[in-house]
Structure formats: structure tokens, C-alpha cells
């Protein structure tokens, strides 16, 4: 009886379009996400201007406070809010509505996230947590900052468990069927989030008693290692969220088909299994690890490039096939047949193009010797503004042009499309200037995580100035991009004309092969992932704990 | 047959002198990466042997029990601290490692697994996680150096590796009890 009721609900949902209650949940997440983007973007602009020596920041809101808030708000909060909103809408659409219990969990997660953000942002504004978004000890923030982080992680967990419950319930109601690809991505992304958050949870639980003064010292290297098992993973989670849109929605938007369902699912599995130990390459110049161990970890890090290259292969195949279907000739004729004037395609396409240099830069940084050259320089900042700030964020923007009208039962106008294209170009050019300048000046030695200084008019430091101007110009353009995007999002939400917008889901090819059953065996993949994580982390962690130095008392460097 | 070729490539790669030197320089990697990879190389090469000698497998391993027993004997043998030491100091034992893990553990494991009843598979899961748990206790708690070639701290690291391996196998076993794949079929 229950199954019948659910099937009826599912059918009604499909024919009537989006469930109003599910839409409200996602729209709430997305509204807050873009408000956060606006604040974080404004802070970014202030930072860029300060770095170029154009703006002196007041004592009560200094560079490091802004840097911490910018990082936390954009890297952790904006992305998390977007991910949950987007995936809950995807589940609602592809699985025929959220279960009432799961919807409730979505709201609980929202409450937890907002509470966490309030704690974190308040402590930063009070000047008690200028520890940057990596919150490395022995720099010590107020304990309430760390407690805020606990709420953020708890929000992620609750929303993740909601996704698993909804997916399992759908599978029980639809025996023998594969979970729809977009929901499959959601499950993969949240499995990865949960696995990745284990390390940082352990770290934060050690930091809280230390911040309260109940324990005197902290194991610095252990904390950094646990942090990066999370930090690197979570970046790859955002990337996986963006990739889900490339695989599932972009082919539909360009009038193509899904190239291979199996390949897409394999990419999800590989991303989940291989990702967590990759975090180690962020510590490649940390002391306390042997060279042999670092060398092993190069392989673990490089293995993540494999699913990315598979994605590149997949996307080119989709583009070429779609182009040829439209009559493209020659080796590269399909390139011209792509819908360049459709922002729903243009934004994710530029995101993908940006990932070519971004991914290559990442591979370069994974190598010990090359990392030594750029490690503490602005190069690294440039790198993650390309990966996260362009590849991930532009894809998120691209999703907005159809997801919001779909949820609000409105339509995107040609005017918004044109504005969206301008926004995308502004963003791309801004990032080209800013990230390009950061990469270049980084190689010349300009440090990251440092406010503007000429080091007593040292000639080398003065030589960085022209590049830092470009950084500021790019940053200003990016803030213009933020303003445009926030306008577009709220315009689509409240002012666009009523109408019907489809949720673009690519169909498989007519002669598509059957997706093998092993792709659904999450029990096995999670175990393999844990085994790979232990392969990567048991050796360094045991060494860091058993051969630990005396530990460090807290420092307040600001 | 592609799999068999990949298995062969992996097998040869693992035996290259710089690869063995690096893998064997760290105790945990020696036992928890190199040795399992040899087993995996053997598993990948299994289709080749099944095709080449179909009678051998159907005659001697009809229900999978002999194969899994052989697998367990080989795995247990390589878990002894002394055998690791000997693999490093006596070339003949090193060669035996290269031969036994892929061909006497990997091949029979893959040939047997599909033939085994669920009950036997459960016994294997439980005994492997119990043995790994015991090895974890041994390597972590032992106050003495068990291998001449590795330090006590490496020994403890290996012990923690065993904790995770035992946990992985046990969690996998538990989820097979609770998640009935046929419910989703």
C-alpha cells in the first residue's frame, strides 16, 4: 500500500512539475548562497585593492579578518549551500519528490548551517578568529569559532544522510532500476563529503578543548594532516557537483545525448575512492614526513587526475556527436555548431575550458620540486581561483539560469540571457587578469596570506607591484560579475515572466549499452574508499602520534 | 583477456627492482600494499589460466573449497613476521613471494569466490577480520622488535593498518547481512 501511494505521488509529481515545498527548500538555500556570495565577493574586492597597495584597511577590520571571512564564506559556506540546494532539487526532480522526512532534514541542515555561520562570522568580525579558512594551529581562534565549524559539518552530515535515505527509498520502490544519474552524483558527492569530514571532525574536537584552555598544547602536524584530508576532499566535492551538471544537463542543453552512463558512474566511483589521500600533497613541504612517503603520495594525488581526464574525454565526445548531428563537417566543424549564445551552455563551457590550465597547474603543484617553487606564493591562490573560482563557480552560475526558473515556474528572458553572457565574459576576463597575475607574481616570489607590504621598499618586492595592479583590476571586474550574478538570480526568482522551464536531463544514446550492476554497489565502494584512505593515512598519522613533539601552546599572531 | 594483460603488466611492474626496493623499505607498504597488489595481479590474470587449463580448475576446485583453503594458507604464511624478514634477506624466499601471492593466492581466490556458498563466504569474512584483528594486537602491543629489518614504530604502524583492514572486512561483512541486494533487483 505504501509503495502504491509513493508511486502515485511520484507520477503526480512528474506530471505537475516541481513540488512547491521542495522548491521552497532549494530556493531558500540558493537565496542565502547568493547573499553570501555578495558579502564574500565584496570582501574579496577589499582584499584585492589592499594587496595592490590602493586601499588602507581600518584597524578594526584588517586584512586578515577579511581574508578569513572571504575564505570561509566563499570556499565553505557558498559552496555548501549551493550543493545542498542543487542536489535536493535534483533528487526532488529525478526521484519524484523528496520524502517528507528528508525535506525536514533539509530544513534542519539549513538551521545548523546558519547557526554555524553566525558563530564563525561573529568571531571573525570580533577579531578573535583571524586564522584564515584553514585555521592552522598553533594560531588559536576563539573556541566559538571552532564550535561554529562543528555546526557547519553537522549540517553537511544531516543533509547527506537525507540524500542517502531518499535514494535508498527510491531504490526499494524501483527494483532493478539504476538510480538516475544526477541522484547518483548526489549520493557520490555526499559519500565523499562524509568520508572527507571524518578527519576534520577529529581535528576540531581536539582544537575545542585547546581553545578553551582545558588542554595546554596541540599537535600541529597532526592537525594540519587531518585538516587537509578534509580540505582537499571538499574542494573535489564541489568539483564533483559542477561535473554532475556537465554530465547530465549540458548534453541536453546543446541538443546532444549522454555519451556513456557507465563512464559517468565510473567517474563518480573513482572520485569517491581515490580522493581523500590526495590531500597530502598540500603538505608536500611540511617537515616530519620522509621523502619516500611524499613520493608515494604523489601517485595517490595524481590518481585523481584520471577521472578528470575521463571527464574531458566524455565532454569532447558529447560536443562532437552533438555537432555532427547538426551537420558539422571536418575535424573541428562541431566546434562552431555549439550554442555559444546560450548562457546555459556558455558559462559551464568556459568553466570546463578553465579547468584545462587549472588541472594542469594542479598536476604541476603535486610534484615535490615544482611545489617548492610556488608553495607559499600567490601562485597557489591563483590556482584555486581557477579551479574553484572559475570551474566550479561558473558552472554553478550556469545552473542558475535554468534551475531557478524551473523552481519558480518562470522563464528566462532573452534580456537575462544577454546579461548572463556579459556576466560570464566579465567573470572570465576578471579571472584571467586576477588569477593570471597571481600565478605570475607567485612565480616571482610574492607570498600568499600576507597583506600589502613593500618590505622596506625592497627592489624585488617593488617589482611585484605592476602584477598586483592587474590583480586589483581583475578583482574589481569579478566584483562587478558578482553584482550582475546576484541581480540575475533574484530577477529570475521574483521578476521573470511566468512560464515553464524544463529541468534538462540528457537522454542516453539509442544504442547505449546496459549500465553494469556493480556501479550500484555502494557498500563495496565505501569499503574500498576506507581501505584506500587507510593506505594513505595510517603511516603518517601513526608516525605523527607516536613520535609526536611536545606540542605547541597557542599563538595569537594578530 | 585484456584483464590478464593488465595483470601481467602490474605483475612485472611490481617486480622491477626500484619498485620492490621502495615498496619494501616501509613495513606497512610491504605488507599492505605490495603483497595485496601481487594478489590482485594474480586475480587479474585468472581468466587466462581458466581458459588455458579449464580441466584443472573444474577437477580440483569444483566447489571452491580447495582454492580458498590454499588462499588462506598462503595469506597466513605471509603474515608471519619471520617470512617478511626472510623475503628481504633470502632471494629464494623473495622469489617464492613473487610466485605464491599471485598464483597460489590471487588465482585460487578469484576462481573459488563465485563457487562458494554464502555460508563459507561469511566464514572467510569473519576469520579474516579476526586474524587481522589478532595481527593488529600482536604488532601494536608487542614490546619487542618482531622483524629484524623494521623498527618498532613501523611495526606499530603496520598494526594500525591491520586495525583498518580488519574493520573494512568486518564492516563489509556486516553490511552484506543488513543490505539485501536482491531487494533492489
Residue ranges and their predicted role:
Chain B
Residues 1-185:
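Alpha-helical membrane segments of multi-pass proteins
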Amino acid at each position: 500500500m505504501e509503495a502504491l501511494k509513493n508511486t502515485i505521488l511520484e507520477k503526480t509529481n512528474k506530471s505537475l512539475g516541481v513540488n512547491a515545498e521542495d522548491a521552497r527548500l532549494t530556493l531558500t538555500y540558493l537565496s542565502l548562497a547568493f547573499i553570501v556570495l555578495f558579502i564574500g565577493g565584496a570582501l574579496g574586492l577589499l582584499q584585492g585593492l589592499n594587496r595592490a597597495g590602493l586601499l588602507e584597511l581600518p584597524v578594526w577590520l584588517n586584512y586578515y579578518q577579511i581574508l578569513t571571512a572571504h575564505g570561509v564564506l566563499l570556499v565553505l559556506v557558498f559552496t555548501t549551500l549551493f550543493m545542498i540546494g542543487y542536489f535536493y532539487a535534483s533528487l526532488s526532480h529525478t526521484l519524484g519528490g523528496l520524502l517528507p522526512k528528508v525535506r525536514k532534514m533539509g530544513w534542519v541542515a539549513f538551521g545548523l548551517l546558519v547557526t554555524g555561520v553566525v558563530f564563525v562570522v561573529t568571531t571573525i568580525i570580533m577579531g578573535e578568529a583571524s586564522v584564515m579558512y584553514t585555521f592552522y594551529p598553533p594560531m588559536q581562534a576563539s573556541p566559538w569559532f571552532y564550535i561554529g565549524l562543528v555546526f557547519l559539518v553537522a549540517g553537511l552530515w544531516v543533509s547527506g544522510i537525507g540524500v542517502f535515505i531518499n535514494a535508498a527509498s527510491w531504490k526499494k520502490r524501483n527494483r532493478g532500476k539504476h538510480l538516475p544519474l544526477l541522484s547518483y552524483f548526489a549520493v557520490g558527492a555526499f559519500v565523499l563529503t562524509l568520508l572527507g569530514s571524518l578527519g576534520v571532525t577529529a581535528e576540531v574536537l581536539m582544537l575545542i578543548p585547546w581553545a578553551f584552555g582545558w588542554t595546554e598544547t596541540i599537535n600541529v602536524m597532526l592537525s594540519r594532516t587531518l585538516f587537509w584530508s578534509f580540505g582537499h576532499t571538499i574542494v573535489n566535492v564541489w568539483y564533483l557537483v559542477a561535473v554532475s551538471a556537465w554530465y547530465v544537463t549540458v548534453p541536453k542543453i546543446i541538443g546532444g545525448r549522454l555519451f556513456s552512463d557507465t563512464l559517468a558512474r565510473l567517474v563518480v566511483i573513482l572520485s569517491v575512492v581515490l580522493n581523500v589521500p590526495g590531500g597530502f600533497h598540500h603538505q608536500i613541504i611540511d617537515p616530519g614526513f620522509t621523502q619516500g612517503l611524499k613520493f608515494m603520495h604523489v601517485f595517490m594525488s595524481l590518481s585523481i587526475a584520471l577521472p578528470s581526464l575521463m571527464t574531458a574525454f566524455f565532454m569532447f565526445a558529447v560536443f562532437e556527436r552533438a555537432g555532427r548531428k547538426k551537420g558539422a563537417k571536418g575535424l573541428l566543424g562541431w566546434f562552431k555548431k555549439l550554442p555559444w549564445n546560450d548562457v546555459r551552455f556558455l558559462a559551464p563551457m568556459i568553466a570546463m575550458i578553465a579547468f584545462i590550465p587549472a588541472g594542469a597547474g594542479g598536476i604541476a603543484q603535486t610534484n615535490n620540486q615544482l611545489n617548492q617553487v610556488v608553495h607559499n606564493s600567490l601562485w597557489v591562490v591563483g590556482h584555486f581561483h581557477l579551479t574553484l573560482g572559475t570551474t566550479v563557480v561558473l558552472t554553478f552560475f550556469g545552473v542558475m539560469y535554468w534551475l531557478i526558473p524551473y523552481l519558480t515556474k518562470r522563464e528566462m528572458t532573452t534580456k537575462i540571457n544577454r546579461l548572463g553572457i556579459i556576466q560570464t565574459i566579465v567573470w572570465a576576463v576578471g579571472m584571467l587578469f586576477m588569477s593570471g597575475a597571481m600565478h605570475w607574481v607567485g612565480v616571482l616570489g610574492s607570498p600568499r596570506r600576507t597583506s600589502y607590504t613593500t618590505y622596506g621598499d625592497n627592489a624585488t618586492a617593488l617589482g611585484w607591484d605592476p602584477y598586483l595592479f592587474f590583480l586589483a583590476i581583475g578583482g574589481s571586474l569579478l566584483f562587478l560579475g558578482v553584482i550582475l550574478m546576484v541581480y540575475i538570480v533574484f530577477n529570475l526568482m521574483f521578476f521573470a515572466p511566468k512560464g515553464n522551464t524544463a529541468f534538462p536531463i540528457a537522454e542516453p544514446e539509442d544504442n547505449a549499452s546496459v549500465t553494469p550492476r556493480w556501479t550500484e554497489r555502494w557498500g563495496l565502494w565505501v569499503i574500498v574508499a576506507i581501505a584506500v584512505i587507510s593506505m594513505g593515512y595510517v603511516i603518517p598519522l601513526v608516525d605523527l602520534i607516536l613520535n609526536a613533539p611536545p606540542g605547541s601552546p597557542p599563538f595569537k599572531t594578530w | 583477456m585484456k584483464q590478464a594483460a593488465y595483470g601481467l603488466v602490474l605483475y612485472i611492474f611490481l617486480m622491477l627492482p626500484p619498485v620492490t626496493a621502495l615498496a619494501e623499505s616501509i613495513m606497512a607498504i610491504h605488507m599492505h600494499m605490495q603483497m595485496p597488489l601481487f594478489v590482485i595481479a594474480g586475480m587479474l590474470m585468472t581468466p587466462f589460466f581458466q581458459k588455458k587449463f579449464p580441466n584443472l580448475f573444474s577437477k580440483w576446485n569444483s566447489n571452491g573449497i580447495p582454492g580458498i583453503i590454499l588462499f588462506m594458507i598462503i595469506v597466513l604464511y605471509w603474515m608471519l613476521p619471520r617470512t617478511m624478514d626472510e623475503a628481504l634477506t633470502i632471494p629464494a624466499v623473495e622469489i617464492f613471494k613473487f610466485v605464491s601471492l599471485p598464483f597460489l593466492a590471487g588465482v585460487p581466490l578469484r576462481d573459488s569466490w563465485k563457487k562458494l556458498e554464502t555460508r563459507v563466504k561469511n566464514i572467510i569474512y569473519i576469520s579474516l577480520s579476526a586474524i587481522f584483528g589478532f595481527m593488529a594486537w600482536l604488532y601494536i602491543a608487542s614490546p619487542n622488535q618482531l622483524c629484524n629489518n623494521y623498527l618498532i614504530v613501523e611495526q606499530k604502524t603496520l598494526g594500525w593498518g591491520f586495525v583498518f583492514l580488519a574493520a573494512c572486512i568486518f564492516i563489509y561483512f556486516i553490511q552484506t547481512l543488513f543490505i539485501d541486494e536482491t531487494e533492489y533487483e
